[in-house]
């Protein structure tokens, strides 16, 4: 409901189709009867479908409903604001060492709760071998399957082939786990100062370091 619905005495119709507190259908009743039931249940009569004939009204705690709706909307905006799409570029004939390096970056991004756009760049005669890019994307998706899933299947995009991986964990969960791990390392460093004097400072530097720009293989 985008606009404020009419509630209780603001409802001005002779009869309504009433829905009970648990979602049960009460049926069409006079408005006076619906208001009487609302008082008996110590709830509000809320018009949830004004354009229906007769209008549909439900018995509910409107204050609680508004609060829960606001919290859900706030959480949705929070998760949306944290959504980041990283990008990793690979060549179809990438060597094993470079592949492992790029895969490591993808793993890190997924652990952080970020989506990753994988771009396979074809050059020259490589463009006649799209299956090379497809197999490479399949291999990468399988290698990181425990951390992410294929959100957008491999597809051609001009001379490139792209695929999007999504994280299994929400961004907020990943950030919370990262903070907990960092605090645990700091506590360990304090308990064992001889082990690593600068452990806590190193963690802070790593946490604040910006993600590196995507590099070509």
Curated annotation (Swiss-Prot):
Region (Disordered): 170-217
GO biological process terms, semicolon-separated: ribosome disassembly
Basic and acidic residues bias spans: 172-189
Places the protein is found: Cytoplasm
Gene3D superfamilies (alphabetical): Translation initiation factor 3 (IF-3), C-terminal domain, Translation initiation factor 3 (IF-3), N-terminal domain
Top-rank taxon: Bacteria
Keywords linked to the UniProt accession: Cytoplasm, Initiation factor, Protein biosynthesis
Coarse class of the protein's main subcellular location: cytoplasm
GO molecular function terms noted in the UniProt entry: ribosome binding; translation initiation factor activity
Keyword Protein biosynthesis applies: yes
Similarity comment: Belongs to the IF-3 family.
Protein name: Translation initiation factor IF-3
Annotated organism of origin: Streptomyces coelicolor (strain ATCC BAA-471 / A3(2) / M145)
Lineage of origin: Bacteria, Bacillati, Actinomycetota, Actinomycetes, Kitasatosporales
């Amino acid at each position: 409901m985008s606009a404020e619905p009419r509630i209780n005495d603001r409802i001005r119709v002779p009869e309504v189709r009433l829905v009970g507190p648990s979602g049960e259908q009460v049926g069409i009743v006079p408005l006076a009867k619906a208001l009487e039931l609302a008082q008996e249940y110590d709830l509000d009569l809320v018009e949830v479908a004004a354009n229906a004939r007769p209008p549909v009204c439900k018995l509910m705690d409107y204050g609680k409903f508004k609060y829960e709706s606001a919290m859900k909307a706030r959480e949705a905006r929070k998760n949306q604001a944290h959504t980041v799409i990283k990008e990793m570029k690979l060549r179809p004939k990438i060597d094993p060492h470079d592949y492992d390096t790029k895969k490591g970056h993808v793993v890190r991004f997924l652990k952080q709760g970020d989506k990753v756009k994988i771009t396979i760049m074809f050059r020259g005669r490589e463009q006649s071998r799209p299956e090379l890019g497809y197999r490479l994307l399949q291999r990468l998706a399988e290698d990181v399957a425990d951390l992410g899933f294929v959100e957008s299947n491999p597809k051609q995009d001009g001379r490139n082939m792209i695929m999007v991986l999504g994280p299994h964990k929400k961004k907020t969960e990943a950030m919370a786990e990262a903070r907990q791990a960092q605090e645990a390392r700091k506590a360990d460093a304090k308990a064992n100062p001889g082990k690593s004097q600068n452990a806590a400072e190193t963690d802070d530097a790593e946490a604040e370091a910006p993600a590196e720009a995507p590099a070509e293989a």
